[in-house]
Amino acid sequence: MDFFDLDIEIKQERLPAECSLNSPLNYSLSAQLTDRMTPRTENVRRQRERLRSHMREHFRVKDLSTLDNDSTRLHARLTEDLITIQSPEIDSSVLENWPPLKSYIASLDYTLPEKTAFKWEQAAPYWNLFAQLRAILLQSQKIKKQETGTRELYSCVPLQIEFVEGVVLYFTDRGSKEEFTKSGELPSVTPYADFLAWIKIISQRAQAVLMAVILRVTDKGLSPLPESLLAIYQNVDDILKRAGQPAIDLLKLWEPLVITKLGELLGDRFGLEEDFRNTIRGEATKLAKNLFISRGLNRLMDILDQQTDAQPLFQFFGLFKHFAYPRVFSRDTIQAIQEVSDRPSSISAVDFLHDQCEIRKEFYIRYINAYHRAPGLDLSALSPSSFLRDSLERGKIPNERSPLYSNKEWYFVKFTKSIEWPVSDTLSTFLSDKAITRDRPAWIEDGHSGRDMSEKRLLLKFIKENFSSVADIVGAAEAIYNKEEDLLIALKVKEMELKIKGRGFGLMTFMPRLLQVLRESIAKKTQKLFPEITMTSSDLDMKKRKFMLSKKSDDRRGFIHVNKSLDINKFCTSQRQFNSNAVFSSLDELMGTFPLFSRVHEIFEKTWIVDGSSSDPPNLAHFTRILDECTALGLDTPHIWADGVFSGLKGGIEGLCQYVWTICLLLRVERVMQKTALTHYILAQGDNVIITIIVPVEIHRDGTIPEQESRRILSLSREIDLSLESELEKSGLTLKIEETLTSENISIYGKDLHCPQHLTLAIKKAASAAIISSEQYQDVPTFLSGLGTSLEALSECVNNKVGVHLFGVIMGVAGWRDLATHQTWRGWRYPYHKKAITGRIRASEMKLSKGEPTELSISVLSKRRRERETLIELLSNSLLGSALGMLAFPTPLDLEKRGVGDYITHRLTIARKAILSGHLDPRIGRKVESACNIPLSSRTDLSKLFDSPFSLNIATEEDATAVIKRQATKILRLQEIKNEKLRAQIDNMDKGIATLDAALAGATNINPRLNYMIRSITDEKESEMFVTKFASARTMRTLAMNHSSELPIVTLLEMKSQQKETYTIWRTKRPPVTMWKCSTVLAKELRDTSWGKNIIGGTSPSPIEAMETIQIDPTEWEDRRSQDAMSINYYLSRAGMDEQTAKLTRGFLVPYYGTQTKPLVAKAYLELKGNPRTNKALLLLSVRESLVKTGSNLDKLIIKLCSHALDIDVASLPALRAQEEAAAGEGLRGGIKESMSPVGPDNFYTNITHKVFNRKWATPYHVNIADFIIQGLIETRRHLLVNERMNGLLPVSSVKCTSCFREKEREFFDIPEEFTWKNESKTSDPAYTYFTTWCDLPRVSNLPEMDQRSATRLLGRGLALNRSSSGEIITKFYSMPMESQRLLHPVELLLGYGEGVIFGYLRSQHINHGALFHIGDESLAKKLRRYVLDTKTQHAKQIGYLFQDEDSLHELLGQGLCPYIPRSIPLTITELTNACAITTIRATEVILSTKTRIHHMPVQAIDESDVDTSRLAANNMQTILGDPRPMNLVHLDCDLTHNMVAWESEVELDILKSENFHIDGLLVELTARELPIGDTPWKQRDWTCSNDPKIIAKGIKTKSLFIHQGVTGAINLIPDLLVVIGGGLGGCAVPYLQEWPDTPIIFATLFDERERISEDGDLIVPPELLVRGMAPRMIEREILEAELCDITNEGNRRLLIRLVTKNKRGGKVVLIDEIENRGAPESLLQSSLQDLFEKLDKVCKLNSVHTVRESTVEQFSQRVNSIKRSRKAVTLHWNRYNRRDQFEALVIVKGEEAKSDYRISTITSAKAFRKIDEQLEIDGRLSSTQWSLPALPSREKNILFGYVSSVFLKMNLALSANDMDRERLIETIEGTAPGLISWKEKLEHRDHAHRSDIEEKGITQDKIFNLICLSWVLKGLRYGVWDTDAQSIVAQTVYITRGPKLCPLGEKPKRIFASFKLQSGKRVEDAKGFLSALLHLEGFFPLGEQ
């Protein structure tokens, strides 16, 4: 697809694929057309007939065979003759326009020599000849009406040319003297394609000579002299003229010959082996001799030998680009092929095919044998442990299920219509399968063996459509194949690659480059279509594959992984394009895509291929006949193209060699690696090799590598590269050193390119000249690909801008102007068409109706103007280069390896330089500006062009992503996509690009979180590359623009790569550990691994990785939060470990006990903060987690270091003295004192945050702040490592997490997740599964090592639970004789046994009853006693041996565990049994009294009381046991009920529109009276909420929704602004928002109260609902999550006032104050509120609504006075959701009320509440007599039911929604309540019960309390009387009547069965909580039984 996109532009009769430009097979076609051979197809026959009649008519020629048809000789002769008669003046008017060109180039800091300095006359002949031929070509392609009978002749004086029927006739005027053609006056004839090839050759020569002429002046010594070029061309023409077609074989050796000469010049650096040079030159001489052109060859070699400089010689590559050239094979291979092919092969075609099979066999067998352990393969060079050796000996490369091979999938294509299979398909598809089907099952994903039937079906279809019978094809193929199962057609998937520098991307312009990226991406989406077998994923991706491979990689520090990814020049790239286009065009047609496929494999020239596309089956006899026919004509055998069989292809068996290739390569690489003696892993597949070398290295403490170590690794790495290079060259493989990627860093950030400087570019070009073949630059402009290597070599090696640029301009003005701007992705738009005709230009395709004018005239501009315009357009376009048009300016060194963004940046830099230089022609300047859309008025403001990111379109501020998106959409729309799926894919991509566009807009650095968006467009591998492209484009641009004049491009690129350093490729967070399913096996495994660990392990990130987080200045916290939910990245503990491995192998473990040391470090930090040496001390303090020490040494060590750093005695700091206290009470939370727990105002939480961060910690979760402090310190350490200074503020880092901080801590320190018990089994009872797995004894084999005591404790549990013989268990733990077992720690054993017994009892309870009620410890103890006595014989069996040994017994007695003093030892059986029973009972009591946890359902929350009990218990336990070790103390909580499910919210999403809320309240006016100020003494108010977790008195959270109903009506105005302070979620605002839908809102609520439905049934409206409803209305979004509700902070008050002022100064504002009074000193909160309201009153018309709830009227009045803002009257609002047991109401203070200093007295308030009560009674009476209350709406019922049922659960009554029926409820409570008390037996026949009948001596107060509550409920349900005076209720007596049944409260039955009364009145507060909750039942059953 060079020069012209011929196959697309010029549609001909379908030629075989081989008839492309340089294929000698055209000769066969012209032989058929000229009667020398029988035509092979109907088409050719007809074409010949038409040609015949034309010749007869115009030339009187009867016999076509008399015509000259040797195009090779003809064109050589024509070239020679025509060049000699050309004029020496170059015909280009560019010379007239020299001045603007000169000033333009001056603007780029270059000087242009005078035009006379150039010797144009040397370039003129070729240039002028080319111009004439090009004119003929364009003219001939115009579409015009032709009169029948007229001839169209074209003249290239004196040659005449005529185009007839796809051939070209050449003849001369009869009058002219010269004879150009051999046949005199008769015309010579060649196919049209040959004519095109000739023009292409002329064009290429003209350009080469012109280039040489220009460079000779601008930069001497860079290019060969024009004379040398002309001489070479002349000699070549001479050779071709003499030898004809076969001489082309000699030209194919041209580049290898140049390489041999280069090798001489460059010497060792080039590294050519001697035998290679001799082979090539020998071949050339031999060939020349056979063709009798030795003298011509010698002359060529002389010219070569005259070149003494490497650089000009280097430009000789590509002179014969249009001819193929062979690859260099190893010597062995060449010999093997020669042995076969040197035999005379033309005797018989059958022999020839036989020889080809021999070659194939030679390749196949030679290596496959080695592969299957042939004795010939010497494996002794490999070390015995070598992975490779192992594989080879087993007989195959390991591929089953290896992660590396997951991308190998076969596709068997079912075609919907028959394809005319072109040549080259059959053999290659058959064979490519052959290589990989050695071991079929391994390759088929599902693993089923045998062949997929679809292959067979496809094959049969193919045969049926192409052959008369199956027998035909089988018979014909048997000559080549002998195996039936080889007859397959299968297509192999290759991963396409998304790399800007990939196949086809070299110097592409912007649009095609972009298109290619999209094309590949789409191709990947259309089922990763066909091309070749090699793996070409990106380097990063391959590195990741390598990580997966190296399972044995070393975890310790002090080892560095160096990864090398080798890039080898492969030997099959050259001919792909030509030989495969036909195949691919068929596929494209089938898939409905435009050119999408581009590649197959070719290898050997002499491969004969059976062609299925021909009309007849390929039978050998028929073939022999044709062969003879050709031989008779003297045609060269290998180049015959005939029916059914053809040759001359370099292709067919690449697939076969793939494995062979891999093995050769592996052996070579392994040999080099063995010498290094380092641990290494090699991954090879095809020509991709990745080596991982593990190098031991010294590392500093902080994780950095010392300088000398770096140098050592670097030199080692380079050494390995060089030895690899020389080793591989022995196989004829050249290594592209500069593309051999190596990571020599401690970790892989970005890619480190390492380039040893030894003329790498030259080697790259010389050794793989094919890299710049047409295959790579499919869409590059004509002159670039025509020049081939030279231009790219210049731009990369020479970078001479003037020469290249000038050349581009001359090309443009010479008529190629359109190419500068209008290259389309389908090919070229011809310059002089008035209207662009895209697609293929051919008259036959244009369907013209009669009479329609078909004029397509050439538009003619006046000559002068046209050239001037052209020049200006060219120059202005070239300034903006590839961003907008053609690439006339060369690419700077290596820039094409980088992204589009960098390219644009580079372009803008050049443009800016030129515009600002002042040399530029003003018209060019204007053009550039208009291209950038700069309005003319703002000419001066040019900086705008260069300072906005990527801006190509300034006026619209469009950035690069937008441009890319726009271009992409535009291009994709041009395609007519017939394939539905593909169209959908493209639409998807459009969407993806749009999202990406939005996310990338203006991003300085891509946030790693964007990765997921990118993945939706491309797949994972691509996204890596995709993201990196844009990662720091803005930075690049800034750098380029700031100092473009003095900044060399190299520095720019270095800066660029530093930018990329910060962009790590590991950016996904570790996924959360999944909850274990309820499978016994899994549960046991988990339990075993988590058992008995006292120390929690955390992985310490190395400092280098730790530095990666973003620091946030706490003062900007809010702003940052709203932009970005910050997350802490998960750092691997070792560079380069993949996540999977990281999960399985822990890094460096850091012990810490609970959180003990954290508060200490934090306090120490506080006290050190003012000290000038703080930084140093902080570093030391925070290094804590990387010191591998344990226990208190850790703190001692830190103290020592700090003292040293600060020169003070740190131990004297008061905070560190707290250490002893903490260590003494190390319990559940590792000794955190009460002050450090997050409850209460003056605690550690508040202090530390205010001091450390100067404000409260801004987090949505309520957590123990000590945990955050450490995190802060670690962040500080990172911060210091980066910045080395502190600005007085700690950097904040927040965690994105949806649950409590424990998880954050686990994530941060990499502590394994505490396993959550989650039952997924459908059948079994969850609790049963739980009991049988989680709490059993772990399997001993799995236990971690333990000290003897813990082990004994565990053993005790096992004895109680497992019932196995004692000896058996003990011997598992210790290998000691039986008799010494009794000397183990008996106390531990017994306590463990006690735990086991308790657990066993609970388990048996569960098994018997199917449910567990919450059992108090006291009752449990009694039940256990009974249980132990029932099972005493069992206990005697298990622990009896303890009492048979005196020492053990005395130890038990000493501890007070055995109150039984035996008379003698051994004991009798009875005594033994009793002793065991009593001792076991005692042990269980000890366990219960210390609240030791029996491992149970995970605990949800831990509060202060737990901490206290555990600390107390720890101390008790130590005194009981005399054991100083801390124990793991937890509290027993069996909340597991059989049928209670968690209450789930059913709130619909339209909650905000709900009508259900409407409830009318009562309004009562309060008017202030004058009172002396000190009239009522201030009372400290009691807390209304008990801290006992068993009691709920928090009040329903959604209550605020209901309480605020109807207030809007009472306020009676529409406010301008609503302000909400306090009040959790701000549910209180909902009723207001319903009423005033348009009012804006400011939220200052406590978002940290976002619980879910807590376990006690509280409900929270999901925040999403509220926020979704309100977000559009919020004025200040940031405040949403702020902690403004703490209005004791003055800054918060100021902020709130400022906001109100800013938004609605003087407007009507409604303020809702939901601030509860708990949790802060009364006076402070009161005064703050008062202050806030008064100040707000001044800036607006304030109406406020306050929630007030107090326990006494005095407090209520006191509170109202403090908030009423001196108003004379306030209003109380009350409805039935307000509590009646306390004084609770909404107080509404209106702004328009008159002011006065009066106060509201207690009496007024009391009256108001009395009024409310009266009103209620009246309502109640009314309703009961006249009408019934409406039923509650179902949603409210659900809310209230969840609340009520949770309270019942606390009282051991599990209710379901079905029980909410009055009759059933009364029945349930009456019947089950007495069951709370255990009676000896059911005494139903007795009418009373004595105390002694109740099992417990003192029935617990809890039980009685529960009974009181239940009987209170009964009374309400029966009579509708809901008493609210808790004080009197608690004092009453509860009666139980016969049945036994519970009586309603206050009702004394005739027959009392039992009665109970609370002993103490302390339960009042509890009762308030319980009753206020149960009062909601009134809503369900308001009026009692009617």
Curated annotation (Swiss-Prot):
A Pfam family annotated for this UniProt entry? Mononeg_mRNAcap
Q: Which UniProt keywords apply?
A: ATP-binding, Host cytoplasm, Hydrolase, Methyltransferase, mRNA capping, mRNA processing, Multifunctional enzyme, Nucleotide-binding, Nucleotidyltransferase, RNA-directed RNA polymerase, S-adenosyl-L-methionine, Transferase, Viral RNA replication, Virion
InterPro entries xref list: Mononeg_mRNAcap, Mononeg_RNA_pol_cat, Mononega_L_MeTrfase
* Domain RdRp catalytic as annotated: residue spans: 560-757
Q: Does the keyword Membrane apply?
A: no
GO CC aspect terms = host cell cytoplasm; virion component
Role, per record: RNA-directed RNA polymerase that catalyzes the transcription of viral mRNAs, their capping and polyadenylation. The template is composed of the viral RNA tightly encapsidated by the nucleoprotein (N). The viral polymerase binds to the genomic RNA at the 3' leader promoter, and transcribes subsequently all viral mRNAs with a decreasing efficiency. The first gene is the most transcribed, and the last the least transcribed. The viral phosphoprotein acts as a processivity factor. Capping is concomitant with initiation of mRNA transcription. RNA-directed RNA polymerase that catalyzes the replication of viral genomic RNA. The template is composed of the viral RNA tightly encapsidated by the nucleoprotein (N). The replicase mode is dependent on intracellular N protein concentration. In this mode, the polymerase replicates the whole viral genome without recognizing transcriptional signals, and the replicated genome is not caped or polyadenylated.
What is this protein identified as?
Answer: RNA-directed RNA polymerase L
Organism classification: Viruses, Riboviria, Orthornavirae, Negarnaviricota, Haploviricotina
